[in-house]
């Protein structure tokens, strides 16, 4: 009797295991998108596994002379240089450009830049590109992705060797808030369709800005944020976070590290893809509830960076406002806004 029962038990065990395996094969693909909210269009798109370009490790530094780091020597900057989560805060005096050049140039990296010029903002394209050609990632391969509703308005700007400009037509919108809200979605789709095969790092910047001094590989990192020039010296309770709890971008008074600017973010293309997807999903969640965050995508960007800390933070010298006098703590301005009539631009 024992042997038949043992055989019967073994048969039931094998049958149950086979059934579970078949059930798993049937539902595993469904599980990949089961967490996507019902209101999102094309949930499969947001779960794409992209074959990103292979990560390139830094090369050993050989036969290069540079000053010895001295822990006890007074630093050349008055700014904080390290966040509480051990991410570097980059500013003039915190890095050696020649040392970084020797480490990064052998990697043959391609750095992408997305910029949007819709409506009257096309008037800023020429100055932006000319300043980028003079100062942005000199000596590296650069691919500008210019999104515009009017490709005929893009001026011809001479580009250096290894530097490309792709003009990508997009729909125009009458309200500037709608343009801002659509940017995360557009960048995310562009990475999925194209940029993940073409660039190693991607920066997303505003077109009404100009480069004023060299911008190099010191800015490269997994996920990079820039401190907003208007709020780097004020307590976080005064940050213009979204304070309504009904919004996905809600931030409590006791939360937050820095207030980051929406005019600049970047990082490894895979991380930027994940970041823009998360922000776009949060924007859609608000839209489903008829809510628009206080500062649109910038509010969602700041909410995301509280939960998911940036691996590198850029000081306000990388995102300055020309209307403000430069404080003594900033030794240099690298990227700043241009003077403009905001009311005219938004009409």
Curated annotation (Swiss-Prot):
One annotated GO biological process: carbohydrate metabolic process
Q: What is this protein called?
A: Globoside alpha-1,3-N-acetylgalactosaminyltransferase 1
UniProt-listed SUPFAM superfamilies: Nucleotide-diphospho-sugar transferases
Q: Family, per the entry?
A: Belongs to the glycosyltransferase 6 family.
Query: Where do the catalytic residues lie?
Result: 298
Source organism lineage?
Eukaryota, Metazoa, Chordata, Craniata, Vertebrata
Origin species: Mus musculus
Q: Which residues cross the membrane?
A: 7-27
Which reaction is the catalytic activity of this chain?
A: a globoside Gb4Cer (d18:1(4E)) + UDP-N-acetyl-alpha-D-galactosamine = a globoside Forssman (d18:1(4E)) + UDP + H(+); a globoside Gb4Cer + UDP-N-acetyl-alpha-D-galactosamine = a globoside IV3GalNAc-Gb4Cer + UDP + H(+)
Co-factor note (free text): Binds 1 Mn(2+) ion per subunit.
Q: Where does Mn(2+) bind?
A: 206, 208
Q: Which PANTHER family match?
A: GLOBOSIDE ALPHA-1,3-N-ACETYLGALACTOSAMINYLTRANSFERASE 1 (PTHR10462:SF49), GLYCOSYLTRANSFERASE-RELATED (PTHR10462)
**Topology in the membrane?**
Single-pass type II membrane protein
- Record pathway: Protein modification; protein glycosylation
Its domain comment says:
The conserved DXD motif is involved in cofactor binding. The manganese ion interacts with the beta-phosphate group of UDP and may also have a role in catalysis.
Against InterPro entries, the record matches this protein to:
Glyco_trans_6, Nucleotide-diphossugar_trans
Disulfide-bonded cysteines: none
